Amino acid sequence: MNRLLICGFGPFPEALDNPAAPAVERLKLDHWATSGATVEYAVLPTVWDEAPKTALEALKAFSAHAVLLVGVSVHAELFRVETRARNRVSQIHADAQGRFWPSPLIDDNGPAERFVIAPAQAMTAAIQARGLTATLSSDAGDYLCNFTLYRLLAEVPMTAFLHVPTLSPRIDLDSIVTAVRAAAQAFAADLI
């Protein structure tokens, strides 16, 4: 059976109440199942180098075939399934430890973009089928979400990323858990 790792990012300066990690932790407690894959979970520190390192260590420990990254976009009003990562990083946003990435590039020798081959369209449709607003996105930003997606795509081709909105009267934690579960189920179905 295939193994899917779901990783949620922890808090960072612009999102001290980042709902990504709590949503992933809730899924773990729910003991839900998906056909086609065994699921494991991890919380990633929102720290340069540590986020991809933690994800890769969890992938290895679990012998996972694929990973679904979940992060918050403080600017998003809907769920966004990312389709690519760019070799760029913000020079004005510090990580959770107050550090800045030392270069405008993630990898000085890497390609300008890395594309997601995971079933982004099916994941988007699955979220929409649950009555939530979701779209495909070709811009994962220039912070740790994009950074980690770019790094992981180099090591684990079956990496997907779901950006979730911040908590609001319109989007509560239950909605975010529903979206992550739907995306994970669609992703796992593609692994069969």
Question: For the regions a protein language model found, what residue spans apply to each?
Answer:
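N-terminal catalytic or cofactor-binding beta/alpha core of small enzyme domains
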Residues: 1-140, 153-157, 174-192
